[in-house]
Swiss-Prot record:
The gene is Nubp1. Residues 1-29 are annotated as: Disordered. This is Cytosolic Fe-S cluster assembly factor Nubp1 homolog. [4Fe-4S] cluster 1 binds at residues 17, 31, 34, 40. Component of the cytosolic iron-sulfur (Fe/S) protein assembly (CIA) machinery. Required for maturation of extramitochondrial Fe-S proteins. The Nubp1-Nubp2 heterotetramer forms a Fe-S scaffold complex, mediating the de novo assembly of an Fe-S cluster and its transfer to target apoproteins. It is found in: Cytoplasm. Heterotetramer of 2 Nubp1 and 2 Nubp2 chains. One of its GO terms (molecular function) is 4 iron, 4 sulfur cluster binding. Signal peptide: none annotated. Its main location: cytoplasm.
Length: 318
């Protein structure tokens, strides 16, 4: 039998944390090396104070979307950028934000075309970088001296960075905050989930996969993670589903779905299937160059499919 979940523990706590309200807080063997050990051992017992700070900071954010993937390389960051750009363009009267919590591999500054921009600080906190008038971005990529700098951090330091993003970035009023996460179910996911589940407004997860079974195996685990953590699943996007020839429009399966693909998996796991995004080589080029694929190639089958997916995502929240 697995150990029960401890609810009252900091987001950056070790795996077997006894909880801040326990008599063993700061004294148990699991507490060794935890950045909160001294506070827990000497301070009053109670919930993580950061949770209240995050709730206050995000009180004007109506909807939060976690973009997840079980495996790397399925296009999760690309889908995050496409989803955010499309919603911002379709709803110019609304405000959108992207938070890149892939601490070790921040790619949103390049994908969204704002690589090299600087984050400014004011009395109300860090100001996110604006991609469009109604689309802003915050990423650790803006805080590095060079895009080639490596982030070599253990879990507690990553979690501290995410806490700082959620408590110190001045997002203002947002209709949607989209979080780009690393692959799998790691410290970043646990930290973001612990904070977001206590905030006001709606939240949910969009999962990204490719058709082949090796990717579907991991996205099944991601769905199980969402159910265990109480994260509403908005649905699954099947990325790179087919290749549509730009000359003759013939469809080819680059990654054959041997077991029925994402749609069949969604039926088995009882989650929504949002749709499939065809593979378009021009999209990869736009991501590398930080260009807006949606406006540059508006007639692409990928853009047409994207708008259908966006409609389903917005229906879930609205």
């Amino acid at each position: 039998m697995s150990a029960p979940e401890v609810e009252n523990k900091p987001a950056d706590a070790p795996e077997h944390c006894p909880g801040t309200e326990s008599e063993n807080a700061g004294k148990a063997s699991a507490c060794a090396g935890c950045p909160n050990q001294q506070i827990c051992a000497t301070g009053p017992k109670g919930p993580d104070p950061s949770i209240a700070l995050v709730k206050e900071k995000l009180k004007e954010v109506r909807n939060k979307i976690l973009v997840l993937s079980g495996k790397g390389g399925v296009g999760k960051s690309t889908v995050t950028a496409l989803l955010s750009r499309a919603m911002a363009q379709l709803n110019p009267e609304r405000n959108y934000g992207v938070l890149d919590v892939d601490i070790c591999g921040p790619s949103q500054p390049r994908v969204l075309g704002v690589l090299g921009e600087q984050v400014h600080q004011s009395g109300s906190g860090w100001s996110p970088v604006y991609v469009e008038d109604n689309l802003s971005l915050m990423s650790i990529g803006f805080l590095l001296g060079s895009p080639d700098d490596a982030i070599i951090w253990r879990g507690p330091k990553k979690n501290g960075m995410i806490r700082q993003f959620l408590t110190e970035v001045d997002w203002g009023q947002l209709d949607y905050l989209v979080l780009d996460t690393p692959p799998g179910t790691s410290d970043e996911h646990l930290s973001a989930t612990t904070f977001l589940k206590e905030t006001d407004g709606n939240w949910g997860a969009v999962l990204v996969t490719t058709p082949q079974e090796v990717a579907l195996l991991d996205v099944r685990k991601e769905i199980t993670f969402c159910k265990k953590m109480g994260i509403p699943v908005v649905g699954v996007v099947e990325n790179m589903s087919v290749f549509v020839c730009p000359k003759c429009t013939t469809e080819s399966d680059i990654f054959p779905a041997k077991t029925g693909g994402a749609e069949k998996m969604c039926e088995e796991m009882e989650v929504a299937y949002l749709g499939k995004l065809p593979l378009d080589p021009r999209l990869a080029k736009c991501c590398d160059e930080g260009k807006d694929f949606i406006t540059e190639h508006s007639k692409s089958p990928t853009v047409i499919a994207l708008h259908q997916i966006v409609a389903k995502v917005q229906d879930f929240f609205d």
